[in-house]
């Protein structure tokens, strides 16, 4: 699908700062392994939550604000992937699907 940029596990592990005594969400989050069969993988996934990045700042610009929010996706990933995986927020219950263009 041309509108999606799919993330592979090795792509987003670059956002994760690992430590020996901690497990981060970025180490546990599920990924799509076959871009051509992403819909089948999504159906079979055990994830409760699916992340899709949508870079836009239309609302901000429409309200005469300062644009630039479309760049926030990478900052979000950098922060989100480094949250600790724990009993309340389990990384394996999340699937990072893609960035929507």
Where are each of the predicted segments found?
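Metal-dependent C-N hydrolase catalytic cores
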Residues: 2-101
